[in-house]
Design a protein with these regions (language model features):
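N-terminal helical cap/lid subdomain that shapes the substrate entry/recognition surface
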Residues: 3-113
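Catalytic-core regions built around general acid/base machinery
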Residues: 114-125
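Substrate-recognition "cap/lid" segment bordering the active-site pocket of phosphatases
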Residues: 108, 129-181, 187-189, 211-213
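Glycine-rich phosphate-binding loop signature in dinucleotide/nucleotide-binding domains
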Residues: 3-4, 124, 173-176
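Conserved small/polar residues in nucleotide/adenosyl-binding loops
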Residues: 231-240
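Acidic, Mg2+-coordinating phosphoryl-transfer loop and its flanking beta/alpha structural elements
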Residues: 183-219
């Protein structure tokens, strides 16, 4: 990256700061174990087709709900329980409890090696903001203190790669796109979205995947050690106190 002042760094979360796929699978298992324990009849009365229909109906009735993953999951479970004959208050209670089981596992993440060190450095030297389409809780994970702000899809009623995440970060950071850097694992949601807003970009590729997009990436980091070497941040020049 050219030697220049970077004042704003935005970070994706899932599969950028920590591996996510296994955690989501285990979270889903925990949720459905709880539901099956409380409502064992679900296995013979509810199938994937019914669950899909419930999801489609929820989004048709409230298109914005798809950006609030916490509420969306709770509403899906609630509708399933109502279909099984539960009373409204019972369905609400157990959907909240089921989601709690999901969320406990969802936030038990292990940061990639070197990630915490770079968070400390970026927090010291820049405006650091997280941009996520998901619903991880940085407070529970224990890294919220490193971020000036967190921006989720719920906050902007949009998913990356659309511009709202990136534009809101620029507004919060009070920075220009050319002073901004986004780091993320997804070629489309992260790199494509950030590039369309004229951010500098680092493709975080710890899985050593092949780049299949037409437009080449700007920089690639296969570890957080690589990412540090690419940022070239100038301490004491990057943020005015």
């Amino acid at each position: 990256m050219p030697r220049q002042i970077i004042k704003l760094v935005t970070l994706d979360l899932d599969d950028t700061l920590w591996p996510n796929k296994k955690g989501i699978i285990e979270s889903e298992k925990a949720l459905w174990r709880f539901v099956n324990l409380k409502f064992p009849e679900i296995e013979r009365k509810i199938n994937e087709e019914k669950i899909t229909a419930i999801k489609v109906n929820l989004v048709e009735n409230n298109p914005l709900i798809k950006f609030d993953l916490t509420r969306f999951r709770k509403e899906v479970i609630k509708e399933i329980l109502l279909h099984l004959g539960a009373q409204e208050n019972e369905a609400i209670y157990y959907s909240n409890e089921a989601f709690s089981e999901f969320f406990k596992i969802r936030n038990k993440v292990k940061l990639f090696p070197g990630a915490k060190n770079i968070l400390e450095r970026l927090n010291r030297d820049t405006n650091l903001i997280s941009l996520s389409n998901g619903n991880a809780d940085l407070g529970i994970i224990g890294i919220a203190k490193f971020f000036k702000a967190t921006i989720s899809s719920q906050d902007v009623s949009s998913n990356k790669p659309a511009p709202p995440h990136f534009l809101k970060a620029l507004k919060i950071g009070g920075c220009k796109p050319e002073e901004s850097l986004h780091i993320g694992d997804c070629p489309i949601n992260d790199i494509g979205g950030a590039r369309n807003c004229n951010f500098h970009t680092i493709w975080f590729n710890c899985e050593k995947r092949k780049w299949d997009e037409i437009v080449p990436y700007e920089y690639q980091a296969k570890s957080w050690k690589d990412a540090v070497s690419y940022t070239h941040l100038r301490a004491h020049e990057t943020r005015e106190d």
